[in-house]
């Protein structure tokens, strides 16, 4: 697990089982993207139930931000939920992310992002990964 994304980022959390927007007549949970997934309504993500994938979504690299003179961009991957390789490091953003200055390895990310991951490139605080913010030291 690489993040602690809440259910309400992709699903309406009901008060009751049969509430509108939870399970309709097809008995399949509805996908309704939340503020992190849509980057505060900047994006219009899509869900394709036939191939179990979502696209144009912040969580999988549909983002860009400026840091200093650099424009950092994600990969904007279309992730297939049944394919575990879709969530490996480097699928949502490059290692380092496109536009990042310098040459870095995954093990060096902690130099600026030590509240998120350790010197081995392992995420240590999942609440700070895929949270809609750039977490710098």
Regions found by a protein language model. Give the residues of each.
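Flexible linker/context regions in extracytoplasmic redox proteins
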Residues: 1-137
